[in-house]
Amino acid sequence: MIRKIPSFIEVYKSLIQIPTISSNNKLLDQSNKNFIDLLSNYFSDLNFSVKNYQIPHTDKYNMLACVGSGNGGLLLSGHSDTVDFDEKKWTKDPFKLTETNNKFYGLGAVDMKGFFALILEVISSINIKKIIKPIYILATANEETDMSGAKNFIQSTIIKPDCIIIGEPTSLKLINAHKGHMSYSIKVIGDTGHSSNPDHGVNSIEIMHDVIRSLLILKKYFKEEYQHPNFSIPYPTMNLSSIHGGSAINRICPLCILNFEIRPIPGLTLTQIEIVIKEKLETIMKKWSHRIFIKKLFSSVPAYECPHNSGTIKIVEKLCQLNSAAVNYCTEAPFLQRIAPTLILGPGSIEQAHQPDEYLEHYFIQPTKNIITKLINKFCY
């Protein structure tokens, strides 16, 4: 029996008011269980079969809701978590949906709890008894940190939809490619001493100077050797993000730490990048093997592309009257792409994500509902 669920606004409010912060800082990190339980109840009320999966060794959960059976169909996906927030910079309650000036404000309003509210609104208005292929709804955990929700899902699922749509905020532009992300920290350990006698110590900043020179050669190599014309910045980028070292003007610096990131383009794998980093740093690492240490800062995200010759892209482009494009930020797409052709298409601007007073503009509501309806009609009826 299908039960009536609350209105779009009431559902949206209820999703925003449940904190689901993901953070690498354990003091800020929160479970998403209450959110997943609520979302599960909404889909259960709409006659979906719902399963919640705990991410091993965490208090985080994925939800997979399904109606219909058989092969193919459509998977609509989003992440349940949000980033943390600076209360001093917010002028509104992050956990209370505030509607004003044709905008919906709240933490996760655009990234990306609003997408779930819109899915529920559409599902509640269609006749799901007539579908011939399944509709899947996936809500993942930890997208904002290590993407362990998506990684865990693809390792355990057996479903094979015809198409996956991730509803990240793209201003309803169709995205078929994005860069990846890798981050590293290099630590150089020297020997301190008084600066009046430099030969009685080892200056870690001087060694780091040679490390940086090698990294800049690598940066140039990426720009010259790898190109992807669909990106506004068509080559892999490297950013030397921060450097710290030294404690006093009259001391030889004993420790210097450099953090940097690389954003690879499709066609350049994480393994390839790791190999070329080792190659470019090989000489200096051999010279100072006991003084230079490199480690990953965060879990790496591969670059992603759903090829333009994919039948799925052609179907969705025609259906939604959109042309696909590439972006520089990361999503769960490279992981979900392993089980089915995956595209990114969702309401709101990425410029509002992770910002104080995050909001979803009202004018995205009806067009998003129209697109979700078209996608369901195409892939499931």
From Swiss-Prot:
**Main localization of the protein described in the UniProt heading:** cytoplasm
E.C. numbers: 3.5.1.16
Which domain of life does this protein belong to? Answer: Bacteria
Any keyword Amino-acid biosynthesis? yes
Which Gene Ontology terms cover its molecular function?
acetylornithine deacetylase activity; zinc ion binding
Q: How is the cofactor bound?
A: Binds 2 Zn(2+) or Co(2+) ions per subunit.
**Subcellular location, record wording:** Cytoplasm
Enzyme class (EC, first level): hydrolase
Q: Give the cofactors, semicolon-separated.
A: Zn(2+); Co(2+); glutathione
Q: Which Pfam families match?
A: M20_dimer (PF07687), Peptidase_M20 (PF01546)
The record places the active site at D81, E143
Entry binding sites for Zn(2+) 2:
D111, E144, H354
Reactions accelerated catalytically = N(2)-acetyl-L-ornithine + H2O = L-ornithine + acetate
Establish whether keyword Amino-acid biosynthesis is in the entry.
yes
This protein's pathway reads: Amino-acid biosynthesis; L-arginine biosynthesis; L-ornithine from N(2)-acetyl-L-ornithine (linear): step 1/1
Subunit field text: Homodimer.
Described purpose of this protein according to its UniProt entry: Catalyzes the hydrolysis of the amide bond of N(2)-acetylated L-amino acids. Cleaves the acetyl group from N-acetyl-L-ornithine to form L-ornithine, an intermediate in L-arginine biosynthesis pathway, and a branchpoint in the synthesis of polyamines.
The record's annotation in HAMAP family points to: ArgE (MF_01108)
* Protein name (record): Acetylornithine deacetylase
